[in-house]
Curated annotation (Swiss-Prot):
The RecF protein is involved in DNA metabolism; it is required for DNA replication and normal SOS inducibility. RecF binds preferentially to single-stranded, linear DNA. It also seems to bind ATP. The gene is recF. InterPro entries: DNA-binding_RecF, DNA-binding_RecF_CS, P-loop_NTPase, RecF/RecN/SMC_N, RecF_2. Its main location: cytoplasm. It is found in: Cytoplasm. One of its GO terms (cellular component) is cytoplasm. PROSITE patterns: RECF_1. This is DNA replication and repair protein RecF.
Length: 396
């Protein structure tokens, strides 16, 4: 998959940008605040519908947007994509309500309006950034988001199940709060429907995650070993919130999907029944994929506690390289590779290894850095160099 062109209008610092991207990619150099991360962010949004850095979506819209035309603030992102068999255009329009500050997003593919679940996955990207370290050191929510993002872009059924599970969870939590003062029997009757829905979609998500990790994990291990030949073996462990022993977890990924979902569903149902009093007291669903975690292990010890920052960063790079391989295996296509100042914290040896690995892939590569010398290496010499300054793009 290739991004042939990118167009931004009133997005972040860009009033208007039209960029034609070479098939192999390009290098972007600019000071902090010049717009290079915003350009990467735009491509990421066109792939996932979400920003990897904005806490408030209205901050994505240029502060002066719409004022000259006398219309509400807006931003527009568009990209022209090519594969071996087809060509398509993606577009996202963000519209800000001036009174509330809320943002409405419109999605179009080839001019046709789509829902987010239909839009995601047309463009697939893998992002490398300094903040990726939080995949290892951050909260369980960040690791769940990582799994959900990958699986949603390669499996639209997973994305639909995730959206459905999230809505069910909201309804169930609201009901738990309203039933806090009721007796157990009345609560059981009213929760029965939502429990079954939660179990059905929750089991689907959990089994899909286990099957992904079974393929991703060995690739992660091998890439990490190539990056650090002296280190112990890097593995991962899925930590479910429902009662699933470790021995059973390893079996589930190898079973037929339907059988695995039945086993997980039965365990999930039992756990919900056991925790009913606690959930009613707290007014919240205490178990399910929304409470699970993934642990990185160096040897047999948690990487968070026993790995240096340098080793943790290598683990994240290995995770991203494994992600590329799985996406290619599942989709038979290469994702667009986005490196946002991801080389700055690597030593020369590991920087060279990463660039050699990525450059050997037939994938489009877009790299940013604050200093051009980081990107001026022989392996990247075929990629044109551009400089960004306050949203303006100039040949390097």
């Amino acid at each position: 998959m290739l991004v042939r062109s990118l167009e931004l209008e009133e997005f972040r610092c860009f009033r208007h940008l039209h960029l034609v991207l070479p098939d192999r990619g390009l290098r972007l150099v600019g000071a902090n605040g010049s717009g290079k991360t915003s350009l990467i962010e735009a491509l990421y949004m066109l792939a996932t519908t979400k920003s990897f850095r904005a806490s408030l979506e209205r901050h994505l819209v240029h502060r002066s947007s719409g004022s000259e035309l006398g219309i509400p603030p807006y931003a527009r992102l568009a990209a022209e994509l090519f594969t071996e068999t087809e060509r398509s255009t993606l577009e996202i329009v963000l519209m800000v309500d001036p009174a509330s500050g809320t943002v409405r997003k419109l999605y179009r593919r080839d001019g046709r309006s789509l829902r987010a679940v239909e839009f995601v996955g047309t463009l697939r990207v893998v992002l490398f950034s300094p903040e990726d370290l939080e995949l290892v050191t951050g909260s369980p929510q960040q690791r769940r988001r990582y799994l959900d993002t990958i699986l949603s872009t390669i499996d639209r059924a997973y994305l639909r199940a995730l959206a459905r599970y999230t809505r069910i969870l909201e309804h169930r939590n609201s009901l738990l709060k309203s039933l806090a003062e009721r007796d157990q029997r009345a609560a059981d009757e009213q929760l029965a429907y939502w429990d079954e829905q939660l179990v059905t979609y929750g089991a689907y998500l959990l089994v899909a995650r286990l099957r992904f990790l079974a393929e991703w994990g060995p690739r992660l291990r091998d890439h990490f070993q190539a990056l650090d030949t002296q280190a112990q073996v890097l593995t991962t462990a899925y930590l479910p919130s429902i009662d699933l022993p470790e021995s059973l977890l390893s079996e589930l990924a190898a079973r037929e999907v339907a059988d695995a979902q039945l086993i997980v569903g039965a365990r999930y149902r039992e756990t919900l029944e056991r925790l009913r009093p606690d959930e009613l007291r707290r007014g919240s669903t205490l178990v399910g994929p929304h409470r699970d975690d993934v642990e990185f292990l160096l040897g047999e010890e948690p990487l968070t506690a026993f790995g240096s920052r340098g080793v943790q960063r290598l683990a994240v790079i290995a995770a991203k390289l494994a992600e590329i391989a799985v996406i290619h295996r599942v989709t038979d296509d290469w994702p667009v590779l986005l490196l946002d100042d991801a080389l700055s914290e690597l030593d020369q040896q590991h920087r060279a290894h990463l660039l050699a690995t990525l450059s050997a892939l037939p994938a489009q590569l877009i790299l940013t850095a604050t200093e051009s010398d980081v990107l001026e290496t022989p392996v990247l010499s075929s990629l044109p160099l551009f400089r960004l300054n306050d949203g303006r793009l100039e040949p390097g």
